[in-house]
């Protein structure tokens, strides 16, 4: 049985949950490819890790940008429910789902449980290049 080292208990829980659903994290290779064994379709998936925005107390979330096996660029975030919910697109805010989700969050909070939200958005190449240039300039 593989033992994982994680930066946080949340990350370890997510990796273990993914494994229970048939997706086993294999590691990150020397070319920054995240390797995921898809036990459902019996294939090894490679997600190119493009950027990581680490968690901090100001952002209250962590984000990664990856290129998936089909070439799509995907922004993935995990963080506090309030932070993720306020950043949802207008399309995602419509309907009963958001209200029902908030009901569950409130119920879990009453039970003393903490919630963690996951969100993703596909971004086009041009938007990514623009964002990445700004991010790299900010590091200097």
What are these language model-derived features?
Residues 1-140:
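Cytosolic catalytic regions of ATP/NTP-dependent phosphoryl-transfer enzymes
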């Amino acid at each position: 049985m593989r033992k994982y080292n994680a930066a946080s208990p949340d990350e370890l829980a997510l990796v273990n949950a993914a494994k229970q659903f048939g997706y086993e994290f294999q590691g990150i290779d020397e070319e920054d490819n995240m390797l995921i064994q898809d036990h459902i379709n019996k294939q090894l998936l490679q997600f190119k890790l493009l950027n990581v925005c680490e968690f901090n107390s100001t952002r209250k979330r962590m984000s990664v940008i990856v290129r998936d096996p089909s070439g799509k660029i995907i922004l993935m975030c995990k963080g506090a429910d309030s932070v993720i919910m306020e950043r949802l697109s207008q399309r995602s805010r419509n309907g009963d789902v958001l209200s029902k989700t908030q009901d569950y969050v409130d119920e879990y909070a009453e039970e003393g449980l903490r919630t963690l939200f996951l969100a993703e958005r596909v971004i086009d190449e041009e938007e990514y290049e623009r964002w990445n240039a700004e991010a790299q300039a900010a590091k200097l």
